[in-house]
Amino acid sequence: MNSSLQRLEKKIGYQFKDESFLKLALTHRSANGTHNERLEFLGDSILSFVVADDLYHRFPKVDEGDMSRMRATLVRGHTLAELGREFQLGDYLYLGPGELKSGGFRRDSILADAVEAIIGAIYLDSDTETVRGIILSWYNTRLESIEPGVSQKDPKTRLQEYLQGRRKPLPTYTVTKIKGEAHNQEFTIECIVAGLDKPVIGKGSSRRKAEQSAADIALGQLN
């Protein structure tokens, strides 16, 4: 195996017996030939099961609704993309020229899909218990810190519920600035919230993320 992939193996905590599984997991459909989408499908199902099983045993008194919300938080694309960045996965992806040029190695969806594909690849290269152990090692900190209840709602939802519960008007979000090229933009949002003297400013790589950032800051100031 080449030294580059060996470095990645150390980061993910698994050494492949068959290098071709890892290479396939890192190959986006924009690259010519076979790509990682079948592995992604497999990995998505495995991840969902492993996380659901852990939550079931970790929280014996929590109902189905809260467990579903916790699982959704843990397996959503944003969380998977965070894992991908922790592994510096963008440095190892095989992308077509168009995706390379547009910064695909930084895109949340591509990183998240590759993480799921790696899970599928590890399963095919090993067995159920091995892939379970790898997933739980990746998620250890997140599983230790997650709690049932309101924390699983996103900041915009929590801010809205906070204001509604106090019979206050809903916040308004306005884009005040968009910086950068189309594939690598930064949005600045101004959020006006009843009860706060000044508008709250949030920034993010999309309008939605900037709004969530502003809502999170507003909640911190209100509480």
Curated annotation (Swiss-Prot):
Obligatory cofactor(s): Mg(2+)
Keyword RNA-binding recorded: yes
CDD domains listed in its UniProt record: DSRM_RNAse_III_family, RIBOc
Main subcellular location: cytoplasm
UniProt entry keywords in alphabetical sequence: Cytoplasm, Endonuclease, Hydrolase, Magnesium, Metal-binding, mRNA processing, Nuclease, RNA-binding, rRNA processing, rRNA-binding, tRNA processing
SMART domains membership: DSRM, RIBOc
BP term (GO), one: mRNA processing
Domain DRBM intervals: 154-223
Entries under PROSITE patterns matching the protein: DS_RBD, RNASE_3_1, RNASE_3_2
Binding residue positions for Mg(2+): 40, 113, 116
Pfam annotation, one family: dsrm
Main EC class the enzyme belongs to: hydrolase
Active site per the UniProt annotation: 44, 116
GO cellular component: cytoplasm
Record EC number: 3.1.26.3
Oligomeric and partner information: Homodimer.
Xref: NCBIfam families: RNaseIII
Function statement: Digests double-stranded RNA. Involved in the processing of primary rRNA transcript to yield the immediate precursors to the large and small rRNAs (23S and 16S). Processes some mRNAs, and tRNAs when they are encoded in the rRNA operon. Processes pre-crRNA and tracrRNA of type II CRISPR loci if present in the organism.
Family: Belongs to the ribonuclease III family.
Record's protein name: Ribonuclease 3
Organism: Aliivibrio fischeri (strain ATCC 700601 / ES114)
